[in-house]
Structure formats: structure tokens, C-alpha cells
A protein has these predicted regions:
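Residue-level signature of catalytic and energy-coupling elements of molecular machines
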Residues: 13, 19, 38, 60, ...
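Conserved G1/Walker A P-loop phosphate-binding module
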Residues: 1-57
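Alpha-helical scaffold elements adjacent to nucleotide-binding pockets in ATP/GTP-utilizing enzyme cores
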Residues: 19-22, 94-101, 127-135, 159-167
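Conserved Switch II/interswitch segment of TRAFAC-class P-loop GTPases
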Residues: 62-66, 76-97, 107-126
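Conserved catalytic network of the ASCE P-loop NTPase/AAA+ motor domain
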Residues: 12, 39-41, 47-52, 73-77, ...
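Signal for well-folded cores of large energy- and translation-related assemblies
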Residues: 24, 28, 32, 72, ...
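P-loop/Walker A NTP-binding module and the surrounding RecA-like catalytic core of P-loop NTPases
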Residues: 6-10, 14-22, 66-72, 80, ...
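Conserved catalytic-core segments of large NTP-driven translation/proteostasis enzymes
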Residues: 134-205
Length: 206
């Protein structure tokens, strides 16, 4: 069984956390403040098994501009990113900012997920997809597949899972084990009696 890391990116309230909950059955918003405000503040983590038997770990990143540092921490080391765009709003400021960050970090594999498709009619959906394609032209996302889904109703989720599984069947980029080890930090928090604690994952590729 192969382990891969996938994650989300996109504007606030475009349905990243809801999409992950629909795929995995788990809510990645753990903190009371997140649930009270209905936004993701810190990184969230969960997993699900792909049809091929491989296991996909999922990192849910914040979409709000105030938490962009947490977003950057989350996408480091991902094998695939789902750029989530709400069909009723289209490309928004944090969509573009997250696209720029993903490009700078060298993310190779991405899927464009048009979410909330249940809220718009077919004509509007075509206009949004055209807008997205124009926005992606000339970027590393230009040839990324576009999947139309609704995390609320389940529309298109099976096809999305199949696309993720298909893209992960190719060899993920081999990690360079000859350089100085680097630990992607997932979370930073304070615990009484222990002080500041960081968590992350360091794996041997040998």
C-alpha cells in the first residue's frame, strides 16, 4: 500500500472543509473557534483509502488571508493539491494567491474542483468553468483536470475520487535523500508544563 499526501487550497468559504468531510466522513475543524465562526484557522488532518488500496492523507488548509502562513505550512510536501473554487462565486482573491504559492512551491499535480455545483444552473456553470480556464492559462495549472462536484449533495464525488486515484498511480516525485533532512511542520501549539510543541512527519525513502 502506497501512502500519498493530498491537500486543499482555495478562497475562504468555497467548501474545502466540507469537501474533505464528504470524502472522508470526518470534520477537520477541531477547534471551538473554527466551528463557531465556520472557518478553518489551523491545519486539519485526516485520511481515506483510495479504490486502488492506496491511502491518501489529507491536509485541510485555511482560506482566509489572515492565516496564509498556516496555508503555506500545509502545502509543503504535498503530492497532489485540490484547488477548490465555488461555482457560485468563481475565482476570488485567495484563489489567485493560493495559485501563486502552489506555483512557487513547485507543486506538480493538481485537480481543479468546482464545488457547490448544486447552487447554479448549467449555463452559469459553463461560464464559471470558462472563467477558470482563462485564469489558469499560462500557469502550471493550465492542463489540470476540472471536476464538478457538490460536497453538500455528493454530486461528482465518486468521479473525483477516481481521478485522484488515477493521478496517484503515477510515481509521485521522488524525494532527494542526499540533502539535509527537512521536516515539514504541521502544527505549532503550547502545552502547559511542556512549552511550545511542533509536530510533523519525517519519513525515510530508503
Amino acid at each position: 500500500m502506497k501512502h500519498v499526501i493530498i491537500g486543499t487550497a482555495g478562497h475562504i468559504d468555497h467548501g474545502k472543509t466540507t469537501l474533505i468531510r464528504a470524502l472522508t466522513g470526518r470534520n477537520t475543524d477541531r477547534w471551538e473557534e473554527e466551528q463557531k465562526r465556520g472557518i478553518t484557522i489551523d491545519l486539519g488532518f485526516t485520511w481515506f483509502d483510495l479504490p486502488s488500496g492506496d491511502r491518501a492523507g489529507i491536509i485541510d488548509v485555511p482560506g482566509h488571508e489572515k492565516f496564509i502562513n498556516n496555508m503555506v505550512a500545509g502545502v509543503v510536501g504535498m503530492d497532489l493539491v485540490m484547488l477548490v473554487i465555488a461555482a457560485d462565486e468563481g475565482v476570488m482573491p485567495q484563489t489567485r494567491e493560493h495559485m501563486d504559492i502552489l506555483g512557487l512551491l513547485g507543486i506538480q499535480k493538481s485537480i481543479i474542483v468546482l464545488n457547490k455545483c448544486d447552487l447554479v444552473d448549467e449555463e452559469w456553470l459553463e461560464l464559471v468553468e470558462e472563467e477558470v480556464r482563462e485564469e489558469l492559462e499560462g500557469t502550471f495549472l493550465e492542463h489540470a483536470p476540472v471536476m464538478k462536484v457538490s460536497a453538500a449533495t455528493g454530486q461528482g464525488l465518486d468521479a473525483l475520487v477516481q481521478e485522484i486515484d488515477h493521478m496517484m498511480q503515477d510515481e509521485v516525485e521522488e524525494k532527494d535523500i542526499t540533502t539535509i533532512p527537512r521536516l515539514p511542520v504541521d502544527r505549532v501549539f503550547s502545552l502547559s508544563g511542556f512549552g511550545t510543541i511542533i509536530t510533523g512527519t519525517l519519513r525515510s525513502e530508503e
